[in-house]
């Protein structure tokens, strides 16, 4: 892939992560009881998150897009050193987002339980495959 294609992939994954963080912020605020629980808002945010998670793919991380290889990248080389584990973590994220979609609009306790799993999935991938700020 050429430099421009790689740059577009990085922009795409940054945009995707930004949108996911936006929806997670709504859910996290409710889970932490910083904002009132609203089943409709939670359900919509979880549906959006699940749809976004389904777009997340190892294809958004082409070779040549690691930290030090491409501008604005936070992707660690471990992504390409352990591609099967990376792909599994993405799959786990999709599964956790689907569980959140099923739980979020039910009640606060269900949202909180799903949020723990979702947060653990996000953290696990970022800990291993994303450069710390």
Swiss-Prot record:
Annotated residues for binding of heme c: 17, 122, 125-126
Transmembrane parts of this sequence: none
Post-translational modification note: Binds 1 heme c group covalently per subunit.
GO CC, any one term: periplasmic space
N-terminal signal peptide: none
Pfam families for the chain: Cytochrom_C_2 (PF01322)
Main subcellular localisation: periplasm
Family matches, as SUPFAM superfamilies: Cytochromes (SSF47175)
InterPro entries: Cyt_c/b562, Cyt_c_II, Cyt_c_prime, Cyt_c_prime_subgr
Molecular functions per Gene Ontology: electron transfer activity; heme binding; iron ion binding
Function noted in UniProt: Monoheme c-type cytochrome, that is particularly expressed when cells generate energy via aerobic respiration.
The protein, known as: Cytochrome c-554
Organism the protein comes from: Cereibacter sphaeroides (Rhodobacter sphaeroides)
